[in-house]
Amino acid sequence: MKFGGTSVADAERIKRAAERIVRAKEAGTRVVAVLSARGKHTDELVSLAYEVSDRPDPREMDMLLSTGERVTCALAAMVINDLGHEAISLTGSQAGIVTDSGHTKARIIEVKADRIRSGLDDGKIVLVAGFQGVSQESYDVTTLGRGGSDTTAVAVAAALGADVCEIYTDVAGVFSADPRIVPEARKLPVLTFEEMLEMSASGAGVLQLRSVEYARNHGVTIHCRSSFEDGPGTVVQDEELTMERPLVTAVTHSTSEARITLTGLPDVPGIAGRVLTALADANINVDMIIQNEPQSDGHLADMSFTVPRDDVATARESLEALQPELGFGGVQSDDRMGKVSIVGAGMKSHPGVAAKTFTVLGDAGVNIEMISTSPIKISCVVREEHVEEAVRKLHTAFELGADAVLPEDVAGVHRPKVA
């Protein structure tokens, strides 16, 4: 089980989460619960760091940010003990979450779950602080980046061979669009890992991308449910769905995109690889990439790509350091970009989806600035102020509303028992 920040935002919600954990235990389940920091606590810690330092040291940021989850776990353990059950709270390090040394964006290398198993064997409920681990090299505290508690939960589930990893959030499951933008969006009962990966990469905030990748790679079924109501939620699994999938499953969006353009880049073999290697070394994820035709002299071109908005300053610094070596004209950035995507396994076997997408956006007066496609996804970069209108128009055009007919019960689908 994993409870997100809104599910443990205050004392009352921590009590409610603890009561749900206890119910699962009383139903005969051996329970490990991964907990996030309370509400906006992590954001408050980040703001505090920047109040005292213009450029906080990444190692010290990890020391600071890892405290939030520890507070939640300790409080939840107190509640569970008061409810008559024995609980033990563990930091990421104590739980055996071993990572690389990438401070603020560390990756899990392995989970040494001996201490978790020992707690379970003693009949205890084990509470694990999400979002954190310990460096294999330096033994320093590390954090996993935004949404890292999802990854912690899936990694622990995989290490324990758990039947399912239940992710509890403030929404009832995964929807065909953000209900705050599209009120008629419908809940999706089941998704393949392939679909969920594309949705997470395109802005769907219910599950963090790395957690879905980890679940797919280790065969862990994920069950997304609401902390505040009982219901079937959404199951994400690796089994092929035997019924025909709808053409488009969902419309996702992101308003945290930035575009960076390198002007006057010499058009020679290997230079794009050099640029992208520098960004990878800075731990910056590059999404869409386009390079125009060389200019009239045949030797210079412009190269544009998108990165997370929070990484613009670091990306510019890395690229400007390359300028003397590569000899390009300059670095330009625009951080007021957004991305709109349509996702659906049914797109594999249906032509014309891209044409319909571009026509719908064109009729709505939304200019497409960059395009990326995969067999089950089409993504368009647009101005940030056009994102919500684009989402609504595409959701309507592909008939994804509450009255849409989607397969509710699919042969071969494993549906975890509701606790």
Predicted regions and their residues:
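Nucleotide/pyrophosphate-binding catalytic subdomain
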Residues: 1-212, 382-383, 402, 409-419
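Conserved dinucleotide-binding and phosphotransfer motif residues
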Residues: 27, 83, 218, 282, ...
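Residue-identity detector for threonine
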Residues: 6, 29, 42, 66-67, ...
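Non-catalytic alpha-helical coupling and interface elements of nucleotide-dependent molecular machines
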Residues: 50, 54, 85, 219-223, ...
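A conserved regulatory-domain signal marking ACT and ACT-like small-molecule sensing domains
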Residues: 232-419
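Structural motif
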Residues: 29-33, 62-63, 86-88, 117-118, ...
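Active-site phosphate/pyrophosphate-binding segments
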Residues: 228
